[in-house]
Amino acid sequence: MLTEASLSIWGWGSLGIVLFLITFGPFVIFYLTFYILCFVGGGLVVTLLFGKTNSEKYLEQCEHSFLPPTSPGVPKCLEEMKREARTIKIDRRLTGANIIDEPLQQVIQFSLRDYVQYWYYTLSDDESFLLEIRQTLQNALIQFATRSKEIDWQPYFTTRIVDDFGTHLRVFRKAQQKITEKDDQVKGTAEDLVDTFFEVEVEMEKEVCRDLVCTSPKDEEGFLRDLCEVLLYLLLPPGDFQNKIMRYFVREILARGILLPLINQLSDPDYINQYVIWMIRDSNCNYEAFMNIIKLSDNIGELEAVRDKAAEELQYLRSLDTAGDDINTIKNQINSLLFVKKVCDSRIQRLQSGKEINTVKLAANFGKLCTVPLDSILVDNVALQFFMDYMQQTGGQAHLFFWMTVEGYRVTAQQQLEVLLSRQRDGKHQTNQTKGLLRAAAVGIYEQYLSEKASPRVTVDDYLVAKLADTLNHEDPTPEIFDDIQRKVYELMLRDERFYPSFRQNALYVRMLAELDMLKDPSFRGSDDGDGESFNGSPTGSINLSLDDLSNVSSDDSVQLHAYISDTVYADYDPYAVAGVCNDHGKTYALYAITVHRRNLNSEEMWKTYRRYSDFHDFHMRITEQFESLSSILKLPGKKTFNNMDRDFLEKRKKDLNAYLQLLLAPEMMKASPALAHYVYDFLENKAYSKGKGDFARKMDTFVNPLRNSMRNVSNAVKSLPDSLAEGMTKMSDNMGKMSERLGQDIKQSFFKVPPLIPKTDSDPEHRRVSAQLDDNVDDNIPLRVMLLLMDEVFDLKERNQWLRRNIKNLLQQLIRATYGDTINRKIVDHVDWMTSPEQVADSVKRFRDAFWPNGILAEAVPCRDKSIRMRTRVAGKTKLLAIMPDELKHIIGAETTRKGILRVFEMFQHNQLNRRMVYVFLEGFLETLFPQYKFRELFNKLHSRSKQMQKYKQKLQTTQAPSLQKR
């Protein structure tokens, strides 16, 4: 039974399943499962939603039930505030000048928009806070403008800034000297220089050192916060200052949003280098200065940057597919770049190996040095300084000073006697005062150098001294009264082995050559300005035209001479007919073909002659020496040491030389100087041109002639002064007395006695600020004051002898008085007034606005420049600075001194920490000038009192003062 029942169950079950599958299909199982899952999931979702709603209702009931009831006054007040917002009236007047207020208001608006509003509107829509900030800033600006109007800015711009800059430069110079004097063989790093700089600063300032502010960003921010808070106390109304939230907010905006970014930019060396290049952007690039910078550079990064750029340019030029005329230009450029690359590689290798070469010491080991004649030394300031130092060492300074004093006496006597004769010719009343003063001056020279009481005494023949004494006693003094003895003294200095011959073997002679720029190697082999042997008249040297000697031709009006430089060299003989460039034993130079026409009554002749630029230069020196009036009329085109084979340059020089020839051959010129024809005919004759001066002589003339011409100009200016005879005699008497007195003091104190070696004390001028060393008589003379400060500190003239420094001072005084007189002070004061005028202030504000917000939009951050670009900018900046230095300055203080001074100033700006120090010094001086009634000096001393260098200095003072106190 059971078996049958189970079979029936399984049978009926199977039948049901089969019928179910046949009826609903084979996927009914999946559908059924899906329906069940949806049912269960829907039930869970409904349960969760119902529970969430009930929970929120319960929590809301709990909150309202436990918290106290809300006061109805608060919502009411909020509604009233929103309904009637308090209006803040802002006066848009700031400085009283509309041209300043308008751009200044835009700066305030842009600042609030880009630095405050963008985050404030995410917190609140209330405008009152923004208006309060604007009102606070305007109040501060109004107080600042009012204070600025009451201040005389002329002393700050003409005195304080110059003193601060000069002192900063002095500290840097002394820090460099300390680094150099260290015994460590390892070269000092930039960190050592910065530390040494602040050590020197505290020694000089005594009461303040800014090392923490300049080297620690955290301390710098704290310093700026304290400073801004003090300024807000002075500029804001008491009510606004007592609002701490507002005060701290404005303080942070000023300190971190305005002052700190501005100081970061002003102290960035790369920014300063770009600004220097922009300031002198109009000056032409000097290739000689560029090569000097490369050869003198001790920064491997600079050399690598220049070398990589040269390699890049070489690759570009070699990839060009050119033919014809352009190929010569490209070859010249490639050769120039290869030379630059070679110089950079050799300099890098030398720096990496540590085998630095001192050019002066290296030249001293060479036997072949340029010979500078004694007469050239005596007329050049730079050369005379070194010869004077040598004569002091050998004890022959009395001979040199006697020669110089006699030269001064001769010039003075000639001028005064000419004035005396001119007044006699005019029939004016004369006195014997002039001759009496000349006699007194001559007797003073005799007593100081030649008498038996003279110490030291100039050793010359006794009969010459006796003859001079007799002349002084019985005859009127003449300018030539000392000529015989002066000639003997000159021969003694020239031939005595103790003096000039030994001087040529001394290290001072090599240093003199360096200052005269006569140790310099030629930087480029090919040169149009070559100083070698002149071309022999034709390209092949085989043309010999049978012409009469032009030197025998007179300057009669019947003979007419015309000459011009043709476009190309004579085609039958010139292999470079287009370029006019020749090559002789590997040396490339340009050759100019001159077509000459000579006409007279019966015949006409024409020929070609060939001259180099060096021939023109030698010819120009010849005729200007013989005919001084031509020096102001004829102007020869200047030299170009590097890359002077360029086609455009050669064409320009050809035009300039043509203009020079036409002016020279003008009939009026020939009539004015009849003897000039001989020199012109000799130059234009078709034969090898014989130079009257060699390489060295022309270089000597280059630095001697400017000084000689300047002395002539000063002499002419003195002669043309419209003084009366009494005034002239009085001035002469004063000058002669001062000359004799000062010269005697200098000889006794500075030259005849060796100064004792004593340690530096607090009274040492080098350990004081620059302003503490100015003469009282030049304190009111603004231009002379500025020039003396800059000359002293930039070129370190205090290390030179006092004769040169006094000579430079007198030269500057004569230059200023002859050029402007007393009006230059007035012009400087007017310029300061113009700088602080409303128009210029408005222009500065507009430039600031346009720089930070071009077209009203905040400028994007400037991307950081690549290191190689910054290094090339450094090289370009140094090259520009060296190129703008006039040759006249080199002739006064020396080429080597000029180079060192310029590079010292440039190197000073390459340290961010030192630039920061200078910016803060200027800022402190500005605030001390703006608020003279407040004790800003004491405030800054307190703010910088945590300086580590200051603490070390105080400890050092205590240790040095302790023994002296114990003795007491």
Swiss-Prot record:
Entry-linked SMART domains: PX, PXA, RGS
Keywords of this entry: Endosome, Lipid-binding, Membrane, Protein transport, Signal transduction inhibitor, Transport
GO molecular function: phosphatidylinositol binding; phosphatidylinositol-3-phosphate binding
Broad class of the protein's primary localization: membrane
Domain PXA intervals: 97-284
Binding site for a 1,2-diacyl-sn-glycero-3-phospho-(1D-myo-inositol-3-phosphate): 612, 614, 639, 653
SUPFAM superfamilies found in the cross-reference section: PX domain, Regulator of G-protein signaling, RGS
GO-annotated biological processes: intracellular protein transport; negative regulation of signal transduction; positive regulation of GTPase activity
Listed Gene3D superfamilies: Phox-like domain (3.30.1520.10), Regulator of G-protein Signalling 4, domain 2 (1.10.167.10)
RGS domain span: 373-496
Domain PX, first and last residues per copy: 570-691
Subcellular location(s) of the protein: Early endosome membrane
A Pfam match: Nexin_C
Keyword Protein transport applies: yes
Domain remark from Swiss-Prot or TrEMBL: The PX domain mediates interaction with membranes enriched in phosphatidylinositol 3-phosphate.
Protein family per UniProt: Belongs to the sorting nexin family.
Name the UniProt record assigns to this protein: Sorting nexin-13
